[in-house]
Amino acid sequence: FCNVVRHCYTIPDDFVEMNLLRFPGKNLMNKLQDAVLTLYNYDDDPDNTDVYQTLVKGVNLLAKLPSIACYAYQSKVHYYDRESLFIHYANPEYSIAENFLSLLRKDQKFTSKEANLLDTILMLHADHGGGNNSTFTNVVIASTGTDIYSTVCGGIGSLKGPRHGGANIKVAEMMDAVLAETGGYDADDKKIRQSVEKLMAGELYDRSGLVYGFGHAVYTVSDPRAEVLKACCMEVAKEQKHTRELDFYIRFERIAKEVMEEIKGKALPTNVDFYS
């Protein structure tokens, strides 16, 4: 299976130049939707929805989307953020996670621990049943008999939402606000506690009263995905000398649960978005 996926890494001729470099996107999720719909035009029989053809087309999309996502990102940061542009070819010897890291970095260098962490993140975020929003969206659209490109495009649109796939971006932004409020990674527990109280009172970050990265509709006691990611993060943090940053997250996690229990009478479990 891995060999089949790697054989499909190659992007169609002129696709990157015509669709990604000439028309950069402000938002990567929207650009991915655009790219998926464009791939429809490169398929000789795009509306064929029999089981075998759907499998072939699905694997083909699975193999190509990581490279397309990286190229869309490089185009975006070049045209909108005024950074240098560099485009690398996908390496057929690499896994999807390894190619992500190679394509995103100017020197294409990465460590095995970094690749393992990203691979773990990809697995933990993969479809875990038909009930989550984007997968359910896929099922609803596919039930009409439409093509897989239209179906996947709809799922990406759902995944973009801040209450679904965009939730970990909210965590990152929230933690940046907390760091600014507390004065940095070496802030004492009292300052972290005050920032959590402000978040819950709607006085910090987006003033929603939410502490992002906590709570889950199914994992009401603990989210095993968060525990797995936390352990992987520890390995990479030690290797990359980011232990101060990780320690801050761990302290925030502990204190946030304490404050939630005091204010709401119940501590919400850390979810997969917090450490991702």
Regions found by a protein language model. Name each.
Residues F1-S276:
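Hydrophobic alpha-helical bundle cores within soluble ligand-binding/oligomerization subdomains
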